[in-house]
Structure formats: structure tokens, C-alpha cells
Amino acid sequence: MTDIAASASQPALVRNELNLVWLDMEMTGLDPDNDRIIEIAVVVTNSTLDIAVEGPVFAIHQSDETLAKMDDWNKSTHGRSGLIDRVRASTVTEAQAAAQLQAFLADYVSPGKSPMCGNSICQDRRFMARWMPEFERFFHYRNLDVSTLKELCRRWQPAIYKGFQKRAMHTALADIHESIDELKYYREHFLIPAAPASAA
């Protein structure tokens, strides 16, 4: 894990109930009842997204039989990124990864306080509820889904929507940082406070 934002001029992230926990998973498919988690990462930020700390990144071991069931897109994407090889070499189970991630997060936020933050995060939550249920309960029941702003921006401000280009690396940690950057972009360009009314 790495503190990616602390510097001599910027303090390290401190424990606070308003801190945000960002999460991303890579899976073998989209169905939590038949597919499995193959990578998971977390990043914790302060509420204004100015300070961030990376947590552990885990490739989750899955059997060759499970990996063989992936469709062509997943085989190509995760093969090209090297994730399939990392999954085969890993000895980490879902339960082990969940326990270590929860222990890491406990240093920065109390259970039940942070929403689960990310892009299309409801999908990650479905897999977590199926394969890491105790870890899923660490989060507040609410989600902070950047995809909501994306879809609103696409409909209401299409020019602004087109201004953020994703790299689509499809690795968990890179996708988290991209989600944080995307939310910062919408905050600057889309979530613009109204000008105060002039005095009568």
C-alpha cells in the first residue's frame, strides 16, 4: 500500500468518518452466482478527494476450470493485462483478501460510515455480497456511484460528457484512480454551484 498524496506540504490521511472508500474488482464475468472475483483493490480519500491512500491490491486465486469459463472479451482483456497469470500464481482466497482489506480500512474509517465508491459500483457490491459478505457489511448501505453523474452528464451536458476520456485499463487500482479523477472532472465542469442571488 502506498500513500500517494502525502508530502511535506500535504498531511497524510487521518481517520475521519467522512473519508471515502473507493473500490474496484475485476471478475470472470457479470453474474455473481456463476462468476468469481479475480482482483480487488481499495483507495481511501478524504471527503474532498485531495488526499488518497492506496490499500493492498490482491489477485484472487481461481481454478483453471473457472478461468476457462470466461468469455472471449474477459480472456483477452485479462490476459493482455497479465491478470490471468497473476490469478494463477496467487494463493490468496476471497476470505483472506477481504480480511486484510477490512483491517486496512479500519485505520481510516469506522464500519458502516463510508458508502461504497466507484463506477458501476452496484455490480462490485453484488459480487461482494456473494463472495465477501462480511466485508460488504463494513460499508454503509449507500453507494457513491460516479456512473450516475456520467449518465446524467451524457443526457444533460453531452459536450462536457465527451470531455473526459477513460483509458479503460481494466485493472482494479487503475480503474479506481480513474473513477476519482472522473468525479473531480464532474465536480469542476458539471456540478457547478449556482451564482448567489443579487441583493434586491
UniProtKB/Swiss-Prot annotation:
Subcellular location: Cytoplasm
Family to which the UniProt record says this protein belongs: Belongs to the oligoribonuclease family.
Gene Ontology BP annotations: DNA metabolic process
Task performed by this protein: 3'-to-5' exoribonuclease specific for small oligoribonucleotides.
The species this protein was found in: Burkholderia vietnamiensis (strain G4 / LMG 22486)
Pfam families attached to this UniProt entry: RNase_T
Exonuclease domain boundaries: 20-183
Record: active site: Y141
The protein's name in its UniProt record: Oligoribonuclease
GO CC annotation, single: cytoplasm
HAMAP family hit by this protein: Oligoribonuclease
Keyword terms of this UniProt record: Cytoplasm, Exonuclease, Hydrolase, Nuclease
PANTHER family named in the record: OLIGORIBONUCLEASE, MITOCHONDRIAL
